[in-house]
């Protein structure tokens, strides 16, 4: 009885997770094959492809109170170690580009601690924290969870690996738990690395795409680019649905040189001075 009482105190229930998980499985079809391919490319087990279920339920627009973004929930600081995170482009928001970053991070974690429970927990808690825990308790993950003390090693980090295992079990038995799933099919995308900077209006005109279509096909493009304040950067891998745009390279060749640029538009910055008000600054810049 005492063991059951002790176990019951470690159980926490969240309502509404079943429907959220079902939708996540259905959404995952858009990206799962490519995610598994990337993990294999980095020599990682394909089971890691369920981590976005834990992090975001495969919602590309997911954004946490801590500033983590995208299906892999990279914070800005960690994201910058593995991908482009800036004012014009935020690759954390692109499911495929972020997967390359996640693969690099997970590979680094595992090569450092040589234990998947610790490496996966490090994805949430941070590698240095897990290395400190490993130094005290070795690879005994149960001891790490029960005895490792750190201000930041709270409920979420302690249970992250358990959530991963639960998600893996559900995904492997998805038809049992979720009959009649409607899995979304991958979108056939064509992409092209831009040799110069171009404006979003130019892209709309010559690639025959609406602003919304460009945004959906290129989720890493941020609002300043989409509203014309910034240009689509040189070297950016512009993406379009293959059935919509058959040959991006040929279409790019039709763009006049006068609307291709060698540099980005400068940002409009204003230093707030004593006595300024928000409405006054907005009026100054017409916003």
Task: Go through the PLM ranges and name each one.
Residues 45-46, 76, 211:
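Alpha-helix N-capping/helix-start residues
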Residues 1-37, 41-42, 81, 85-112, ...:
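Extracytoplasmic and endomembrane cell-envelope/extracellular-matrix remodeling and assembly machinery
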Residues 60-62, 224-225:
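A short, acidic/glycine-rich surface segment
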Residues 45-53, 69, 116-121:
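Alpha-helical scaffolds flanking conserved acidic
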Residues 62-82:
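Short, surface-exposed glycine/acidic/tryptophan-bearing loops
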């Amino acid at each position: 009885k005492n063991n059951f009482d002790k176990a019951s105190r470690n159980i926490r229930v969240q309502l509404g997770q079943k429907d959220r998980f079902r939708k996540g499985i259905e959404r995952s079809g858009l990206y799962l094959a490519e995610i598994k391919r990337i993990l294999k490319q980095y020599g990682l087990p394909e089971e890691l492809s369920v981590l976005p279920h834990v992090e975001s339920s495969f919602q590309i627009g997911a954004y946490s109170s801590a500033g983590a973004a995208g299906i892999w929930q990279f914070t800005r600081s960690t994201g910058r170690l593995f991908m482009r995170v800036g004012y014009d482009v935020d690759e954390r928001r692109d499911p495929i580009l972020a997967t390359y970053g996640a693969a690099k991070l997970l590979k680094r974690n595992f090569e450092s601690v040589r234990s998947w429970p610790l490496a996966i927990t490090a994805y949430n808690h941070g590698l240095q924290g897990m290395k400190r825990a490993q130094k005290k308790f070795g690879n005994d993950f149960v001891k790490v969870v029960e005895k490792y003390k750190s201000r930041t090693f709270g409920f979420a980090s302690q249970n992250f690996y358990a959530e991963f295992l639960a998600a893996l079990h559900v995904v492997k038995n998805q038809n049992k738990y979720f009959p009649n799933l409607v899995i979304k099919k991958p979108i056939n995308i064509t992409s092209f690395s831009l040799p110069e900077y171009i404006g979003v209006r130019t892209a709309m005109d010559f690639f025959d795409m609406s602003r919304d279509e460009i945004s959906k096909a290129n989720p890493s493009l941020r609002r300043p680019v989409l509203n014309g304040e910034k240009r689509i950067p040189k070297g950016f891998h512009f993406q379009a649905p293959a059935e919509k745009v058959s040959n991006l390279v040929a279409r790019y060749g039709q763009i006049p040189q006068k609307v291709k640029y060698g540099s980005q538009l400068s940002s409009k910055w204003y230093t707030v001075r004593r006595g300024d008000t928000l409405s006054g600054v907005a009026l100054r810049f017409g916003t």
